[in-house]
Amino acid sequence: MGKLIRMGPQERWLLRTKRLHWSRLLFLLGMLIIGSTYQHLRRPRGLSSLWAAVSSHQPIKLASRDLSSEEMMMMSSSPSKPSSEMGGKMLVPQASVGSDEATLSMTVENIPSMPKRTAKMIPTTTKNNYSPTAAGTERRKEDTPTSSRTLTYYTSTSSRQIVKKYTPTPRGEMKSYSPTQVREKVKYTPSPRGRRVGTYVPSTFMTMETSHAITPRTTVKDSDITATYKILETNSLKRIMEETTPTTLKGMFDSTPTFLTHEVEANVLTSPRSVMEKNNLFPPRRVESNSSAHPWGLVGKSNPKTPQGTVLLHTPATSEGQVTISTMTGSSPAETKAFTAAWSLRNPSPRTSVSAIKTAPAIVWRLAKKPSTAPSTSTTPTVRAKLTMQVHHCVVVKPTPAMLTTPSPSLTTALLPEELSPSPSVLPPSLPDLHPKGEYPPDLFSVEERRQGWVVLHVFGMMYVFVALAIVCDEYFVPALGVITDKLQISEDVAGATFMAAGGSAPELFTSLIGVFISHSNVGIGTIVGSAVFNILFVIGTCSLFSREILNLTWWPLFRDVSFYILDLIMLILFFLDSLIAWWESLLLLLAYAFYVFTMKWNKHIEVWVKEQLSRRPVAKVMALEDLSKPGDGAIAVDELQDNKKLKLPSLLTRGSSSTSLHNSTIRSTIYQLMLHSLDPLREVRLAKEKEEESLNQGARAQPQAKAESKPEEEEPAKLPAVTVTPAPVPDIKGDQKENPGGQEDVAEAESTGEMPGEEGETAGEGETEEKSGGETQPEGEGETETQGKGEECEDENEAEGKGDNEGEDEGEIHAEDGEMKGNEGETESQELSAENHGEAKNDEKGVEDGGGSDGGDSEEEEEEEEEQEEEEEEEEQEEEEEEEEEEEEKGNEEPLSLDWPETRQKQAIYLFLLPIVFPLWLTVPDVRRQESRKFFVFTFLGSIMWIAMFSYLMVWWAHQVGETIGISEEIMGLTILAAGTSIPDLITSVIVARKGLGDMAVSSSVGSNIFDITVGLPVPWLLFSLINGLQPVPVSSNGLFCAIVLLFLMLLFVISSIASCKWRMNKILGFTMFLLYFVFLIISVMLEDRIISCPVSV
């Protein structure tokens, strides 16, 4: 150039023409490029990538929608000189994809200008949450009023400002240069981008909010920017911004230009907001307008896997916490509060968002002034360190913990207590389940239609499913489990604790599974806790109210099950304290169940050992009493008593030993049979009982008459006190009354004194009578004979026990238990075998008592022997008849499901009512009660599980619809309606069994099924969830469930202590009290869940 100039004017002229020529070409070329670019940008579908980016912004658009137009105008109206720092910062997030620069440039454009304005105008802007886009927003608004106002504000001007700082530097420089990139983009197509961005970006900018603007200022410095980027790192956004493939940035930009800026700048402030909005507000709108399945997918441009949605999701969770905490030290507490509020705004709770937005402006503005106030990354406090001055609060959301950690907890906690409390909403982004909405199919009726009365259909369907679940369990599932136990040769006790408990608790187990994996709620926990309280209070209380007599409970089965239940409840309460269930906690609960099953395997041995330990003190007491009168003979008698006890205890174990297996087919009449074949089962049981009692009363009348005739008038009163002490421990065993028919007064006294527990009374009474008679009146020879006879009797009883056990496997142990508990004059089988020896022993005792040692005693003894033998023969006949009846009942219970048309009209109506349930089951599931179908028990087992799962899903779904219509949560539905519905079949069975005299089986079964629910029904879904999601903990936070579990624990202690204080008997007053306590529990639980009252024991 210089040479040409020197050469001369002509050459100089030629040179000038050349320069003009090239300038014109460049100008024309630039115009063509600008024009074509403008046209492409103007057409929404011109660039698919741009359109996608715009659509991704739509969620942000919703965010802008949150702010009133006035607020937005305020933001734009208060023009603030764009700070270069701000512009640069904003640009940083925007600088992204080179190819999409044009598209992004518009967004960037807007963003940069927004930051500038934000710096000064943030106070006003903050109100809108879109303050960053204040001036820019205005322009955007003008460009595209349809789009969020903020976006409309976008102007190329902002891009120019950014251009000033524009530097095409690698992402590493992004902090400083990224604004430049943004400017570049702005230069290219500010207005076109403005439009699109106007539609989508505005909301993005709004989403970014003043917080973003503030952050950009903070990020103006490289260090500040770094902090911003770190924030993005925490969330996938950071990754996008820093890693930033330009695409990533672009994608982020496109999807949420403000979002990225926001996150980078405002410590994820806007990002949370964006997320919140996305979750609450934009999902419908944004998605619709964007016409993209996932607006976040745009962000995903850079990160398809972690599209904007992903980023938003992660950021929201993290940023939520972060934003809450992000405040500048420089800013006053008020600022901090405002900042937090702003964060809250973006948070998924819309309530906070409005107020937060208002407060945020001031804070953001101040922060803008202080560029070093870059929020620290949620996960990386290091960023905080960099901007120590201003990075005051950065909520660090750890991936596992749900709790947010704040540098300055005082402000954060005071401002946002709920956010800091452990709740699924604050869970780290890594947790896949943030309790989204339940995965239910669309309902035929809207909420308004249901409230007009159509909800009645849902209520009816829910009740109908309760019946269906009971039929599936009773008719197919439990029989299939019975076949499995036979094949595996599992003992009755273990089967009752495992398979039979599973049969009765299957609905609760599947409800828990549905609650964890489908409805994403605590409905399973509520159902299991509510069912536990229902079983303990309502079922046991109803049994005692409707039983024909006071329930005398065997203490060992109840003590054993309640001990395990208390241990399991304590574990559950401890695990609930942090509102997260880790995988190892679920495993511990399962191991507790395995320990329970192991204990049931050795139940008889443990029971014998425990009772032997407990029996030493009462026996010593008897020894002392006897030693006072007859020291010499007392020791012999006591040794004999202990031997007899060891031999006799096993025969008593049959009662209640498998008490957890209330679902045994020998005991349980299925719901279908009850509804069709015995519409009034309680009445039939009552009639049968009355017949039995009449025959027993006749026998009892004959006995006293015979005794009165044979007894001499002169009875020795001195011997009576000793005799009354002896039977004292007899309270629980009615079988003792049979062996000592005339000793009912003594039994009453024994119950009142209650010196010794349970079964010990029987042997103690007999032993002491022998002591008395042998020591005082009998010659030694007679005493030896008596001892031998007694030993034979015990051996015979032992044999009877073996026989009873065998029968228990084939026909159920109920016969033996019936004999002992009903008072049918003796233990059923042992009576037959030891009738003669038994009679002789008693005749000897009574003869000695009556005759003293006189000569007339022998004749009287002979007469008594004859009379008692006759009575016992009659008793044996009655017992045989009862056994036959019970066998018939068992056969009836074992009959396969029949679809025969019933006779009466009432039964026909019930048949038609149940046909929609029974007919599909009859078609699809083999009935293992038919011999030819027994080999298909595996198909029955699997088929019934599928039906139970389907019915449980319908039950939970319709319960959710009913709760949604009425306005109550799924947790409350589980605690109340679902818990009662799944437990009603057990309630009916328990009442029938209790009226038959097997009260302790009904009571112990209620506790046993609860053990299965807590140690299998709850931890199995939790463990599966953790295994599927990489051993992540399961969130179980709920307002009232923790307190409900504590209440359940207290109720259990009350029930057991009350029963024990009443000598293991349950009267009607105690039953009525438990009945009322159940309703008190329901009222308190509902009030806790609805936050009407606060839980005093919550952590």
UniProtKB/Swiss-Prot annotation:
The modification Phosphoserine is found at S658. The modification Phosphothreonine is found at T724. InterPro entries: K/Na/Ca-exchanger (IPR004481), NaCa_Exmemb (IPR004837), NCX_ion-bd_dom_sf (IPR044880), SLC24A1 (IPR004817). It comes from Homo sapiens (Human). It is linked to Night blindness, congenital stationary, 1D: An autosomal recessive form of congenital stationary night blindness, a non-progressive retinal disorder characterized by impaired night vision. CSNB1D is characterized by a Riggs type of electroretinogram (proportionally reduced a- and b-waves). Patients have visual acuity within the normal range and no symptoms of myopia and/or nystagmus. It comes from the Eukaryota. Calcium, potassium:sodium antiporter that transports 1 Ca(2+) and 1 K(+) in exchange for 4 Na(+). Critical component of the visual transduction cascade, controlling the calcium concentration of outer segments during light and darkness. Light causes a rapid lowering of cytosolic free calcium in the outer segment of both retinal rod and cone photoreceptors and the light-induced lowering of calcium is caused by extrusion via this protein which plays a key role in the process of light adaptation. It is found in: Cell membrane. Expressed in the retina, particularly in the inner segment, outer and inner nuclear layers, and ganglion cell layer. GO terms for molecular function: calcium channel activity; calcium, potassium:sodium antiporter activity; symporter activity. The uncleaved signal sequence is required for efficient membrane targeting and proper membrane integration. Residues 474-497, 544-563, 607-907, 957-971, 1032-1039, 1090-1099 are cytoplasmic. This is Sodium/potassium/calcium exchanger 1. It is a multi-pass membrane protein. The chain crosses the membrane at residues 453-473, 498-518, 523-543, 564-584, 586-606, 908-928, 936-956, 972-992, 1011-1031, 1040-1060, 1069-1089.
